[in-house]
A protein has these predicted regions:
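Charged catalytic cores and adjacent phosphate/nucleic-acid-binding surfaces used
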Residues: 1-39, 45-59, 64, 79-92, ...
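Short, conserved structural micro-motifs that define repeat-unit consensus positions
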Residues: 43-47, 149-152
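Ser/Thr-glycine-rich phosphate-binding loops at phosphate-binding pockets of nucleotides
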Residues: 45-46, 68-75
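Short, ordered loop/turn segments at secondary-structure junctions
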Residues: 73-74, 95, 157, 217
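Active-site PLP-lysine loop of aminotransferase-like
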Residues: 96-97, 125
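Active-site neighborhood of divalent metal-dependent phosphoester bond hydrolases
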Residues: 112-130
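Divalent metal-binding pocket/active-site signature
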Residues: 124-170
Length: 320
């Protein structure tokens, strides 16, 4: 079913529910946490390209009163360490870089499920660097995650480069196929730009998917800038069921330009050792953009010619 979202101020809502499911504003965490289970579903530690230790992340999450999902790139040490703590609500997760360069978030009910998935299906296909693409295709990652009862979410589906699923590397048919396999899309990414988050929101509604939000934080100042919340118990299984059942709400605001620059500069230390992989992916993405642009020009010419033929045919018919 296609849902056409309406906009009211900074909020999107559907005609199915009166309450707003996507709100673009800084979360009032103290109010939200009094009524809902609130989680920042996208955060990185120093086990991949984040700046902070798990201890620092836990301390900040506890101060904000929210749950946290450490979703390091191609690594689970941070999520496993966080799961050992009893003072912070956390959801075990990982952000995997597929062979094609796009990212996939996967969440699990238990840390043991995450470990089993990682050791059995992901680790054998990892690259030499934590930020290097693994050798698994998007479809393979999703299928393996489902085998372990994981919840699959596509982060930042629209973004500047190839890391989102909605990019020219994938054909329209393949994008639709991948989206149909997933449980949700990240409609608010705190590190993204607003217009792409808007497109991601419309995508989530139109595909009738679960909606999530996360800061995509690499430093503590980003935590809680975008959150997902649900009326459920503070248990990973209950929260993930809410995503599956499309019973989550999202709220967040993108961080400012200077903070984006600060966050990006902090990631350089891990990306510096991954230049060859990044170069290859950027080359493929550039070629895909050129091909996509050529295809659009070609389609436009064909449409123009078809319209002209239709006009000529109509004129001939009128003369007769």
């Amino acid at each position: 079913m296609i849902i056409q979202p309406a906009k009211s101020g900074n909020a999107f809502f559907t005609d199915i529910e009166d309450n707003h499911r996507v709100v673009f504003q800084r979360p009032a965490l103290s109010a939200l946490t009094n009524a809902y289970t609130v989680v920042d579903l996208h955060f990185h530690s120093r086990h991949s390209d984040g700046f902070n230790s798990v201890d620092a992340i836990a301390k900040r999450a506890r101060k904000l009163g929210i749950g946290i999902a450490i979703t390091d790139h191609n690594a689970i040490a941070g999520a496993v360490e966080m799961a050992e703590r009893k003072d912070v609500f956390c959801i075990p997760g990982i952000e995997i870089t597929a062979r094609e360069g796009a990212h996939i978030l996967v969440y699990f009910d238990t840390v043991n499920d995450l470990i089993d998935f990682y050791e059995t299906d992901v680790a054998p296909w990892l690259g030499k660097n934590v930020m290097t693409s693994c050798a698994m295709s998007m479809e393979s990652i999703v299928a393996c995650a489902k085998k372990h009862n994981g919840v699959v979410v596509f982060p930042h589906p629209y973004c500047a480069v190839y890391t989102g699923v909605c990019n020219p590397i994938f054909s329209r048919r393949r994008q639709e196929s991948l989206l149909s396999m997933a449980d949700g899309v990240e409609v608010i990414n705190g590190a993204n730009v607003h217009r792409w988050n808007l497109k991601s929101t419309v995508l989530g509604f139109n595909m009738n998917m679960g909606l999530t939000a996360g800061s995509d934080g690499h430093n503590l100042f980003q935590m809680g800038s975008a959150v997902t919340y649900a009326a459920c118990m503070r248990e990973p299984a209950a929260f993930l069921d809410a995503i599956r059942e499309k019973m989550t709400w999202t709220m967040g605001k993108e961080v400012g330009f200077l903070r984006k620059v600060t966050s990006s500069s902090m990631k350089l230390r891990t990306n510096f050792n991954n230049t060859s992989d990044l170069f290859g992916k950027n080359m493929r993405y550039g070629l895909a953009l050129v091909h996509s642009g050529s295809r659009k020009v070609r389609d436009s010419i064909h449409e123009t010619m078809a319209r002209r033929r239709a006009v000529k045919k109509q004129r001939k018919f009128n003369i007769v």
